[in-house]
Curated annotation (Swiss-Prot):
Keywords: GTP-binding, Hydrolase, Metal-binding, Nucleotide-binding, One-carbon metabolism, Zinc. GO terms for molecular function: GTP binding; GTP cyclohydrolase I activity; zinc ion binding. It comes from Xanthomonas axonopodis pv. citri (strain 306). It catalyses: GTP + H2O = 7,8-dihydroneopterin 3'-triphosphate + formate + H(+). One of its GO terms (biological process) is tetrahydrofolate biosynthetic process. This is GTP cyclohydrolase 1. The gene is folE. Belongs to the GTP cyclohydrolase I family. Toroid-shaped homodecamer, composed of two pentamers of five dimers. Pathway: Cofactor biosynthesis; 7,8-dihydroneopterin triphosphate biosynthesis; 7,8-dihydroneopterin triphosphate from GTP: step 1/1.
Amino acid sequence: MSQSNQPDSPVTQTQAEEAVRTLLRWAGEDPTREGLLDTPRRVAEAYGDWFSGYRDEPREYLERTFEEVAGYDELIVLRDISYESHCEHHMAPIIGKVHVGYLPRGKVVGISKLARVVESYARRFQVQEKMTAQIAQCIQDVLQPLGVGVVVEGAHECMTTRGIHKRGVSMVTSKMLGSFREDARTRAEFLQFIEVGGKR
């Protein structure tokens, strides 16, 4: 978490559990009844998992690279990276997939590291557009490739379980940097590789 986003003092597990009890009472429940006695602890632990990205520095995952790639200088694409996030407006789940591509400039990174970058940004309160840009910019800043493309698909529970109640709707966002933005052929090749919403 960046320094500017940190609270003045860390919130304890006990304080987090008490906040859950307050929400239960606000909803009209009795947090002392048997079925809810362990709920505050369980919710706090679940939040610790769901928002573990705040304890990560995504750039560190990309620092170990491989420069001996036998002159490989073509597109590298990792598609269908599943993710789970939560929208910062309603704290409702966002579930979807991320597709990442980059055109290396002399060095590549292990593919699991790209997935870890996605996971690190997803496990925070997010806006999909922002998350898309964060993933792309992180890869561009650390690997300094010729270009980066990121496409994110997301189903937003804040739209399906409340408000307009529209199911089966998927939001798609993209961020193109470098050659992916400037060269239509590179961009088209990337989009053909991932075929968002199409048959594979």
